[in-house]
């Protein structure tokens, strides 16, 4: 049995005037001469949860210990799951949490649209969206398949009546990407902006919010995971200029994806690293960035609000919209930009973690929205690409190769969609663990 010795002068637990070793005094302010590494309980201070504060001496001054928010585990908030279709009803497990947003794509059929479903709009045949089309929600779901339910460890898919099935064709291979937000709302908000929302309509970190609704447009439902920097917001447009609505996060979003769910509209995407706050991209096209002159997104984007104009892309009167908002979280997610060098030894993009999923888009010229993950390719180089803007099947080629490393990802190709010399690119990445 191992023993631990406590030696006087090295570890001093309760002698107010000693200046040696590790110190845990219980009196008031320590009056002796401090030494670096000492710890004290300063009863003249106060904290949010205690009448006294633990402090440490850094060699110059006494400093309070500060609680740090734990870094979210990637596997608790994002996961990729592969599955094979059965042309019926199928429960997909292994996600590791109950998703609030799941994005599905067939890997081996170029006629299959993407299928995006979230807990705010709900599941079922009337709620699917496709990132590669302008269609309203549910336009393709009943015929081509849909996600019918979220569960504690995944989701259920239902084949449609028409081939090809977007989510569950017999023997077809699929990839699913799932994110955790704040839980499924249990009600639709009927309160106006500035008022307390209908109970259960705004879910922040799994709890129904009682805070007043931010913005000039009252969100109808919100699901936000503040620790993971991801929220889902539904709202109804009013057709007016210079409007705002709350996003439910506690930091400024760095990537905002919006879709008119009532009608046929493009998918505008705002990113912090575009030319200006008025610029945006389209998720469903390969187009370069464009200037919306404030009619789409505008300077109203803040730590509580998303600012929009009167464009039909984001704010037609009486039309319904869905927004997916993201910001970087150290150790879990990173949203940023880089400049290509045109070499197969391309830029190394520091993320602070090993990526599990990366999406890249060139902004100054046409290119697809390229997606790589660590489940379709388990080792470097990662060469299997799906494109959010296309129904095309998975491409596997060294032309699209990138490496996932412990602290970054590196572009190891010179393709236009990844690494043209002088080209500007945005990316969003999520951690493996």
Regions flagged by a language model, labelled:
Residues 23, 30-57, 100-105, 256-258, ...:
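Short hydrophobic/aromatic-rich beta-strand motifs
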Residues 67-433:
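Surface-exposed molecular-recognition determinants
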Residues 15, 32-33, 47, 55, ...:
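Generic structural signal for beta-strand residues in well-ordered domains
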Residues 58-68:
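Tryptophan-rich substrate-binding surfaces of secreted polymer-degrading and adhesive proteins
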Residues 4-47, 66, 74-89, 231-240, ...:
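Extracellular/surface-exposed low-complexity repeats and stalk/linker segments enriched in Gly/Pro
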């Amino acid at each position: 049995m191992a023993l631990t010795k406590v030696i006087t002068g090295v570890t001093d637990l309760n002698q107010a005037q000693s200046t040696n070793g590790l110190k845990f005094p219980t009196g008031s302010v320590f009056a002796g001469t401090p030494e670096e590494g000492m710890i004290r309980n300063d009863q003249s201070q106060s904290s949010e949860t205690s009448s006294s504060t633990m402090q440490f001496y850094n060699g110059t001054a006494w400093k309070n210990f500060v609680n740090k928010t734990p870094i979210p585990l990637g596997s608790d908030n994002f996961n990729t799951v592969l599955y094979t279709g059965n042309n019926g009803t199928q429960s997909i497990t292994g996600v590791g949490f109950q998703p609030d947003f799941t994005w599905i794509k067939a890997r081996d059929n170029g006629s299959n649209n993407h299928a995006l479903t979230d807990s705010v709009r709900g599941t079922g045949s009337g709620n699917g969206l496709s990132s590669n089309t302008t269609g309203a929600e549910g336009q393709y779901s009943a015929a081509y398949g849909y996600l019918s339910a979220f569960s504690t460890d995944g989701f259920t898919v239902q084949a449609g009546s028409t081939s090809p099935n977007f989510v569950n064709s017999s023997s077809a291979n699929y990839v699913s990407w799932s994110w955790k937000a704040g839980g499924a709302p249990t009600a639709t908000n009927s309160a106006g902006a500035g008022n307390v929302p209908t109970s259960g309509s705004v879910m922040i970190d799994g709890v129904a919010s009682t805070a007043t609704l931010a913005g000039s447009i009252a969100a109808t439902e919100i699901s936000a995971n503040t620790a993971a920097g991801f929220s889902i917001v539904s709202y109804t447009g009013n057709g007016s200029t210079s409007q705002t609505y709350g996003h439910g996060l506690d930091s400024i979003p760095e990537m905002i994806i919006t879709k008119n769910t009532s009608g046929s509209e493009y998918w505008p995407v705002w990113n912090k690293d575009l030319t200006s706050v008025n610029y945006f991209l389209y998720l469903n096209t390969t187009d370069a960035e464009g200037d919306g002159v404030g009619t789409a997104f505008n300077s109203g984007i803040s730590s509580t609000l998303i600012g929009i104009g009167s464009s039909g892309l984001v704010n037609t009167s009486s039309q319904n919209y869905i927004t997916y908002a993201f910001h970087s979280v150290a150790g879990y997610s990173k949203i940023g930009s880089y400049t290509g060098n045109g070499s197969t030894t391309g830029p190394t993009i520091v993320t602070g973690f090993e990526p599990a999923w990366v999406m890249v888009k060139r902004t100054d010229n046409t290119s697809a929205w390229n997606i790589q993950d660590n489940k379709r390719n388990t080792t470097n180089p990662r060469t299997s690409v799906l494109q959010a803007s296309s129904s095309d099947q998975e491409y596997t080629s060294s032309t699209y190769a990138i490496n996932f490393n412990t602290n970054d990802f590196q572009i190891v190709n010179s393709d236009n969609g990844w690494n043209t010399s002088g080209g500007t690119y945005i990316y969003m990445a999520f951690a493996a663990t």
